[in-house]
Swiss-Prot record:
Residues 502-530, 914-971 form a coiled coil. InterPro entries: ARM-like, ARM-type_fold, FH2_Formin, FH2_Formin_sf, FH3_FHOD1-3-like, GBD/FH3_dom. PANTHER family: FORMIN HOMOLOGY 2 DOMAIN CONTAINING, ISOFORM I (PTHR45920), FORMIN-G (PTHR45920:SF7). Gene3D superfamilies: Formin, FH2 domain (1.20.58.2220), Leucine-rich Repeat Variant (1.25.10.10). It holds the Pfam family FH2. Interacts (via GBD/FH3 domain) with activated Rho-GTPases. This is Formin-G. One of its GO terms (molecular function) is actin filament binding. Keywords: Actin-binding, Coiled coil. It comes from Dictyostelium discoideum (Social amoeba). Disulfide bonds: none annotated. The gene is forG. Residues 597-623 form the FH1 domain.
C-alpha cells in the first residue's frame, strides 16, 4: 500500500522572534528549505513491518535523523488522530498500528512535531519577554483546540504565563489572553490545577475589578464555572481569593462583585449574580450559607436585588428564584414568582411545539434505518443502499475496500470476553483469600488475649507463693525456744521441713521460668505472623502443662501427702474456652424442586424456631385484617419463578398514616430476562470456614520481697499509689480544698479502693510490731486512718470529674440516633431501591399468597445477595443494582447518604441504662454531699461550695437529657411505623439491628454498583482506539465552557435548595426548569 506523507511544521506567528519559522530554525530540526518546498512524499507500506521501522523510514525521507525522531509523530490527515500517542517504545504494544492502518485503507498521513515538543516551545515563548504577546495569544487560542496539545500545555504550567499576560496585558493582548485562558479551562486537568494553585485563582479574581467590560464579564464567568465544576474545592478557592483580594485592597469581601449589579452591562449583572448563587450552592454547611447571606445583606445585596426584580431576562429571573430558595430571602411577592414561572413554562411549551415537525421527520428516518438494518440481517443476495447513501457521504470520506478485518474484530472481542470472565474469577478467589486471612488474623488476636490472661494468673500465683515463703521463714525465726531435748528434736524436724519447703519453692520457680520461656516462644511465632499450619505445629509442640503450674503448699511433702491437716492442692487451670463464633442461626432450607410431572408448587420451608431468631431483628407485621384485600393486580409469570420469602404488607385503603410504600416508584424491567435468570431451580450451598484455637504469651512477674500485714493485692496497690500522691498531710489538704492539680481522676479512683478500713487498722495495731518495722503501706494506713468522710468526699469528687465525659457520650449517642432517623426517612435513593425490590419481588411471587404486596419487611434485604439465578451466577442483588444503575444512577451513593446509620451502636434499652447509671451516680454523690454537710467538718467548706453548685447544675442537665431521650425514642417508633411495622413491634425493636440491616444492605448495594461502574469504564476504555488521548473536557459541544456557563445561568446543573420552612409551596414547580 502506497502512503502519502506530508511534512507539517507548527504555524507560529512570523512576528515572534523566538519562534520564527525562518530557514535557520528549520535547519535546527534537520529540515532544509528544499525539502520544505518539495511538499509531500510517498512511502510503500509493508504490512509485515513493525511500526518503529515504518516511522524511522518516513523520518529519513525528510532528512530527520534517528536521534531527533523522538520529537516527531505521525497523524492521520482525515481524522487528525495520532498513530502512537502517548508514545510506546515497546514494539509488542505498537505492532497492531501497521495492521490497523493497512486494513483501514488510510493512505494520507502527516508528519509533524509531537504535542509535548510543540507545547514546550509555546510555554517558552510565553515566558520570553521579547515575543509579540498579542500574536502569541491570538494563535494559541486555536492551538488549544487540539486535545493532545492542550493537555501537554496545561501539564507544563502554561496557564501561569497566560494569567500573567491577562493581568498585565492591555487592549487586544488582554482580550486574546482571556480567550486562551477560557480554552485551557475547558479541560478537567486545567480545572484541577487552578483549584490547587491559590495564587492563580487570586489573579483571576482580581480581574473582576478590571475597567474593561469584556475582561470583567469573562473573569466572572470563569469564576462561577470553576466554583460549580469543582464544588466544595472550587468554593474554598474562590472564597479564599475573595478574602485575600479584599485584605489587599482594604475592603470587605465580595463588595466589588455586589457593586457590579449596578453595571450598565446586563450580561455583567447576570454573571455577578450567578457567581454569588454558585458560591451559596457549594457552601460546605448551611451555617456558612446563613453567614454569607447575612454579610451580603449588610453590604446591600438584598436591596439591590429588589430594585432589579423588573428585569425580564430569563437568566436573571432564574437566578432570582435560586437566590430566594437558597437564602430564604423573599425578594418578590408570591404572585410575582408564580407569574415568572408560568411565563417561562409557556415559552418552553412554545419551543417544544416548534420542534414537533422536526421530531416527526427524525422518527421517520429512524424507522427507515431500522428497516434497513432488519433487511441487512437476513440472508439476501441484493440489498438497496440508496436509502442510507445520503448519510454515508458527510460522515465517511473514504471507504475500506477490504472488510475482512470485521471477522478478526469479532474473534478478538470473544477473546476479550473470555479474559474478562477469567479476571472476574480471579477477583472472586482473591476476595475469598482476603476473607480467610482476616478470620485467621482475628483468631490470632483472640488467642493472644487469652495468653495474656493466663500469664497474669501465673504471676499472681508466683507472688502468693513467695509471700507464703517469707511469712513461713519469719514465723520460724521468731518461734520461742523449748527445752534442750525437745529443742534438738524440733531443730532436726524444722531443718528437714525448711529444706523441703525451699526445694519445693525452687522447683515451682524453675517450672515458671521454663513456662515463661515457652510462652515467649509462642508469642514470637504469633508476632512473626507465621502461616496457620506452622503456627498450629508450634502450638502442638508446646511444653506447657497443667502439672508444671500446680502450686505446692509449704505443708505438703515430696510424695504429695499433706503433713498436717492441709487441704487439697488447688485444681489445675481449666482449658481456655472456645472462641465464640457469633452470628445468626442458619436460614431455613430452600423448598424442594417441583415434580417432573407438574402439579401444585411445593409448600414454603418451615419458619425458623423461636430460639434461633436474631435479637432485635425486625419481625414480621401482621398481613392485615381479613377484610383488607390487595390493591395490585395478580402477576402470572410465563415460567415458574423461584420464590422470594418475604412477609408482605397490605396497606389499608383509608384511615391510615403516611407510609414509605406510598412514595416508592416501581420501575419497568425486562421480564423475559428476569425469568431466564430467576426461574425455579436448585441452588448451591456455600460452606463455612472453621476456626482454630491457639494460645498466648506474657511476661514473668517480679517477686514481692516486702512483708505486708494487709491483703497482698491491697498492699501492692497502696505501694504503687504512694509514688503518685503527696504526703498524708498534703493529701488531706488536697481533699479539703478539692485541688484538681494535685489529685487527678485516676489517682482518686485508686484512693477510693484503698481507703483504710477499720479491719486494716485493727490488724496493724494488733500485730504489736513497731511502726519503724512496718512497710510503707501499713505506715500510710496508720497516718491517714481517721480522716473524716474521706471515701464519701472522694466519690462525690470523682463524679464531678467524670460527669462531663459521661454526659457528652450520652449526648453523642442520642445525636447519632437522631441523625440516623432523619437520614433514613429522607433518603430518596433508598425509596427508589425499595421500589425496585418490591416490583421484582411481586413478579417472583406472582400467583401466590406472597404476591400483590404493598411493601415488605426489611429482613428480606439480607437474603438478596444469596438468592441466585438458575445458573447460580447472578444474585438478585446484582440484578437490582443493574436496574438501579440504568434508571437511577445516583442511587450508587446510597451508602454515603446513609453513612450515619453505621454509627448507631446501642439499643434504646442500653441508652436508658446509661442515663439511669448517670442518675444513680448523681444520687449517690448527692447523698454523700449531704452526709458531709451533716458531719459539720470545719475544713470542708470549700468542698461543700464546689460540689454543691456542681450538683445543682447537674440535676437540671439530667432532667433535660431524659426529655431529649424520650423525644428521640418517639421519633424512632414513628420511623418503624413509617416502614410498615405495627406499633407493638416498634415498642420492642432494637434500633441497632434495625439500622444495621438497612446500612449493611446499602453498603453491599453501593459496592455492587461501583463494580458495575468500573466494568463499564473498563469496557469503554478497551473499546476506545489505542493510543488516543481521552477528551477530558468539562462539557460537550464546540465550546464546552460556554455550554456549561449557560446551563449554570439557567439553573440546569442542580444548584441545591436550602432545606427549611422558608421554601415556598412553589418549590415543586421550580423543579420543572431543572
Amino acid at each position: 500500500m502506497i502512503l502519502s506523507i506530508t511534512f507539517q511544521l507548527d504555524p507560529i506567528s512570523n512576528n515572534s522572534t523566538s519562534l520564527s519559522n525562518s530557514i535557520d530554525n528549520r535547519s535546527s530540526i534537520n529540515v532544509t528549505a528544499l525539502q520544505m518546498q518539495q511538499g509531500s512524499k510517498t512511502y510503500n507500506l509493508d504490512q509485515n513491518s513493525s511500526y518503529k521501522t515504518v516511522f524511522l523510514a518516513i523520518c529519513q525521507l525528510f532528512g530527520i535523523k534517528e536521534s531527533s525522531a523522538q520529537d516527531y509523530c505521525l497523524q492521520l490527515e482525515s481524522s487528525k488522530k495520532y498513530l502512537n500517542w502517548p508514545p510506546q517504545s515497546d514494539e509488542s504494544k505498537t505492532k497492531h498500528i501497521v495492521k490497523q492502518l493497512y486494513e483501514s485503507g488510510e493512505t494520507a498521513l502527516v508528519l509533524q512535531l509531537n504535542p509535548t515538543y510543540r507545547s514546550s516551545k509555546w510555554v517558552k515563548a510565553l515566558n520570553d519577554s521579547e515575543t509579540n504577546e498579542k500574536d502569541i495569544m491570538f494563535h494559541l487560542k486555536y492551538k488549544l483546540q487540539e486535545n493532545e496539545f492542550a493537555e501537554s500545555f496545561i501539564e507544563q504550567n502554561g496557564m501561569e504565563g497566560i494569567l500573567r499576560m491577562v493581568t498585565n496585558g492591555k487592549g487586544n493582548a488582554q482580550t486574546y489572553s482571556l480567550a486562551s485562558l477560557r480554552a485551557c479551562l475547558e479541560y478537567v486537568s486545567a480545572m484541577e490545577i487552578i483549584t490547587k494553585t491559590p495564587h492563580l485563582v487570586k489573579q483571576l479574581f482580581s480581574l473582576v475589578d478590571s475597567n474593561v467590560v469584556g475582561v470583567c464579564r469573562g473573569a466572572l464567568e470563569l469564576l462561577f464555572v470553576l466554583c460549580d465544576f469543582r464544588k466544595e474545592e472550587g468554593f474554598k478557592s474562590v472564597h479564599l481569593a475573595a478574602k485575600g483580594t479584599a485584605v489587599a485592597q482594604g475592603k470587605k469581601p465580595y463588595l466589588n462583585v455586589i457593586k457590579l449589579l449596578d453595571s450598565g452591562d446586563l450580561e455583567t449583572k447576570i454573571n455577578a449574580f450567578t457567581l454569588l448563587n454558585v458560591l451559596l450552592s457549594n457552601c460546605p454547611t448551611d451555617e456558612k450559607v446563613g453567614k454569607l447571606c447575612k454579610k451580603w445583606g449588610e453590604l446591600g445585596l438584598d436591596d439591590k436585588l429588589r430594585s432589579l426584580t423588573s428585569i425580564q431576562q430569563q437568566e436573571f429571573q432564574i437566578q432570582l428564584e435560586i437566590y430566594e430558595e437558597t437564602s430564604g430571602v423573599n425578594l418578590r411577592t408570591k404572585a410575582s414568582r408564580l407569574e415568572a414561572i408560568c411565563n417561562r413554562l409557556k415559552s418552553k411549551l412554545t419551543e417544544y411545539e416548534a420542534q414537533q415537525p422536526l421530531i416527526a421527520i427524525l422518527k421517520e428516518e429512524l424507522k427507515l434505518a431500522q428497516q434497513l438494518i432488519k433487511e441487512a440481517s437476513t440472508d439476501r443476495v441484493f440489498l438497496s443502499s440508496h436509502p442510507m447513501q445520503r448519510y454515508l457521504g458527510p460522515t465517511i470520506q473514504s471507504y475500506p475496500a477490504d472488510l475482512s478485518f470485521l471477522k478478526t474484530t469479532a474473534a478478538e472481542r470473544d477473546k476479550i470476553n473470555e479474559f474478562e470472565k477469567k479476571i472476574l474469577a480471579i477477583n472472586e478467589q482473591l476476595r475469598q483469600e482476603t476473607k480467610l486471612s482476616e478470620e485467621l488474623k482475628n483468631q490470632v488476636l483472640a488467642n493472644k488475649k487469652q495468653f495474656d490472661s493466663t500469664i497474669a494468673e501465673l504471676n499472681e500465683e508466683n507472688q502468693r507463693l513467695t509471700q507464703v515463703e517469707v511469712k513461713f521463714k519469719l514465723q520460724q525465726s521468731i518461734s520461742p525456744s523449748q527445752d534442750s531435748s525437745n529443742n534438738q528434736k524440733a531443730s532436726s524436724s524444722s531443718s528437714n521441713t525448711s529444706t523441703l519447703n525451699d526445694s519445693d519453692i525452687q522447683s515451682i520457680q524453675s517450672s515458671l521460668k521454663e513456662a515463661t520461656l515457652e510462652i515467649e516462644r509462642l508469642k514470637l511465632a504469633i508476632e512473626e505472623k507465621m502461616p496457620p499450619n506452622e503456627a498450629q505445629q508450634i502450638f502442638s509442640q508446646s511444653l506447657i502443662t497443667t502439672a508444671a503450674f500446680t502450686p505446692t503448699s509449704p505443708d505438703i511433702s515430696n510424695d504429695g501427702q499433706p503433713i498436717s491437716g492441709g487441704g487439697a492442692p488447688p485444681p489445675s487451670p481449666s482449658p481456655p474456652p472456645p472462641i465464640s463464633g457469633g452470628g445468626a442461626p442458619p436460614p431455613p432450607p430452600p423448598p424442594p424442586p417441583p415434580p417432573s410431572g407438574g402439579g401444585a408448587p411445593p409448600p414454603p420451608p418451615p419458619p425458623p424456631p423461636s430460639g434461633g431468631k436474631k435479637a432485635g431483628a425486625p419481625g414480621a407485621p401482621p398481613t392485615g385484617p381479613a377484610a383488607i384485600q390487595p390493591n395490585k393486580p395478580v402477576i402470572n409469570p410465563s415460567s415458574k419463578m423461584k420464590p422470594l420469602y418475604w412477609k408482605r404488607i397490605i396497606l389499608p385503603p383509608s384511615n391510615r398514616n403516611e407510609s414509605i410504600w406510598d412514595q416508592v416508584l416501581e420501575p419497568t424491567f425486562d421480564s423475559k430476562d428476569f425469568e431466564n435468570l430467576f426461574c425455579a431451580k436448585k441452588k448451591a450451598v456455600d460452606s463455612s470456614l472453621s476456626t482454630n484455637p491457639s494460645s498466648t504469651t506474657g511476661k514473668e512477674g517480679e517477686k514481692v520481697k516486702l512483708v505486708s500485714l494487709v491483703d497482698i493485692k491491697k498492699s501492692n496497690s497502696i505501694a504503687f499509689m504512694l509514688a503518685k500522691i503527696p504526703t498524708a498531710e498534703g493529701l488531706k489538704k488536697a481533699i479539703d480544698t478539692v485541688d484538681n492539680s494535685i489529685l487527678g481522676k485516676e489517682i482518686i479512683k485508686t484512693l477510693i479502693t484503698n481507703v483504710p478500713t477499720e479491719q486494716d487498722y485493727q490488724l496493724i495495731k494488733g500485730s504489736e510490731i513497731h511502726e519503724s518495722k512496718l512497710d510503707k503501706p501499713e505506715r500510710w494506713i496508720l497516718e491517714i486512718y481517721g480522716f473524716p468522710m474521706m471515701k464519701e468526699r472522694l466519690v462525690a469528687w470523682l463524679f464531678q470529674l467524670e460527669y462531663q465525659e459521661m454526659y457528652n457520650n450520652i449526648i453523642q449517642i442520642l445525636e447519632k440516633l437522631q441523625n440516623a432517623i432523619k437520614d433514613t426517612k429522607s433518603s430518596d435513593s433508598l425509596k427508589k431501591i425499595l421500589g425496585i425490590v418490591l416490583v421484582l419481588g411481586n413478579y417472583m411471587n406472582g400467583g401466590s399468597g406472597r404476591g400483590q404486596a404493598d411493601g415488605f419487611t426489611l429482613e428480606i434485604l439480607d437474603s438478596l445477595a444469596t438468592s441466585k439465578d438458575v445458573e447460580n451466577k447472578t444474585s438478585l442483588l446484582d440484578y437490582v443494582s443493574k436496574i438501579s444503575m440504568e434508571k437511577y444512577p445516583k442511587t450508587m451513593n446510597v451508602a454515603q447518604e446513609l453513612d450515619s446509620l453505621k454509627l448507631v451502636q446501642l439499643s434504646i434499652s442500653d441508652m436508658s441504662t446509661d442515663i439511669n447509671d448517670l442518675e444513680k451516680q448523681f444520687n449517690i454523690s448527692k447523698n454523700n454531699c449531704k452526709k458531709v454537710l451533716e458531719a459539720n467538718i470545719p475544713s470542708s467548706s470549700k468542698f461543700q461550695s464546689t460540689i454543691g453548685s456542681f450538683l445543682e447544675k447537674t440535676e437540671i442537665d439530667i432532667k433535660n437529657l431524659k426529655e431529649n431521650q424520650k423525644n428521640i425514642v418517639d421519633s424512632f417508633i414513628q420511623l418503624v411505623e413509617f416502614f410498615g411495622y405495627p406499633k407493638s413491634y416498634a415498642t420492642t425493636a432494637s434500633c441497632q439491628q434495625f439500622f444495621n440491616s438497612i446500612y449493611s444492605f446499602s453498603l453491599l448495594f453501593s459496592k455492587q454498583c461501583q463494580k458495575i461502574e468500573k466494568e463499564r469504564e473498563a469496557l469503554a476504555k478497551a473499546s476506545g482506539d489505542n493510543g488516543a488521548v481521552q477528551n477530558k473536557k468539562i462539557a460537550g459541544g464546540a465550546d464546552p465552557l460556554a455550554a456549561l456557563a449557560n446551563a449554570i445561568k439557567l439553573g440546569q446543573t442542580g444548584l441545591r435548595k436550602r432545606p427549611g420552612p422558608e421554601n415556598s409551596s412553589g418549590g415543586s414547580q421550580l423543579n420543572l426548569n431543572k
